[in-house]
């Protein structure tokens, strides 16, 4: 063999480079793995929203001045599983169309219907709105066994004692005879019910106006609004609670 003749590579009789094995390819993920992760995330998020805590926003001025339109709040759902609401607490509850006998007859809906309506972006679609699927936010003013009196201006007495409500700034207008556009109220609260009013007494559709009666059943309460997280300059705990009636 000539010294200048190229030698074949060792182990290759043809003189070509040996074939190297391809590196192992990572196994391809099944599309089901991705969708399973998405579904699991959604299930956890919906479970937290359904049973623990959820965010709500203020759509109207019924709780002015303490709660402004478009305020964002956190509502926790654990407190009232073991106790009744306390006076002064701000509660979120299902619309009276869901429990008021007169209104229920006009706006019937099933639980699945409200579940769909309350999903993000779906409830805003034209034709899907249902008053029975709405939620309201008001303040608890009277508890089971108490006699509540509300005069035409919106001032409250509990068992004959005036209720100190520093959060109320806007009472209903009344004339020289004490009459006005707002309804008065005089009733004894039954067990497992409360009476709720908006802080803006002149512009709140609350217990005073429900056609089937002024009482909110405890089991219709969604939760307690306890924290405002928007706007950022107003972040903080909600209050104040009304002092006890003596």
Each model region followed by its residue ranges:
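Soluble "head" domains of membrane/secretory-pathway proteins
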Residues: 2-36, 47, 51-57, 62-246
């Amino acid at each position: 063999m000539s010294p200048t003749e190229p030698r074949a590579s060792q182990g290759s009789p043809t003189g070509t480079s040996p074939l190297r094995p391809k590196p192992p390819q990572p196994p391809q993920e099944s599309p089901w793995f991705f969708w399973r992760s998405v579904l699991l995330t959604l299930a956890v998020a919906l479970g937290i929203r359904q049973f623990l805590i959820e965010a709500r926003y203020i759509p109207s001025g019924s709780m002015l001045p303490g709660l402004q339109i478009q305020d964002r709040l956190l509502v926790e759902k654990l407190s009232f599983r073991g106790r009744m609401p306390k006076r002064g607490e701000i509660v979120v509850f299902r619309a009276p169309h869901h429990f008021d006998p007169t209104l229920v007859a006009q706006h019937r809906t099933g639980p699945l219907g409200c579940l769909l309506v309350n999903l993000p972006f779906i409830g805003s679609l034209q034709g899907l709105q249902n008053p029975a699927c709405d939620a309201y936010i008001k303040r608890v003013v009277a508890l089971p066994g108490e006699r509540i009196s509300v005069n035409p201006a919106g001032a409250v007495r509990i068992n004959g004692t005036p209720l100190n409500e520093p959060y109320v700034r806007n009472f209903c207008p009344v004339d020289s005879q004490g009459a006005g556009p707002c309804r008065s109220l005089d009733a004894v609260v039954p067990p497992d019910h409360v009476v709720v009013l908006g802080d803006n007494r002149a512009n709140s559709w609350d217990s005073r106006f429900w056609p089937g009666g002024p009482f909110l059943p405890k089991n219709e309460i969604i939760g307690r609004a306890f924290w405002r997280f928007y706007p950022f300059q107003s972040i903080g705990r909600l209050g104040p609670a009304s002092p006890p009636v003596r």
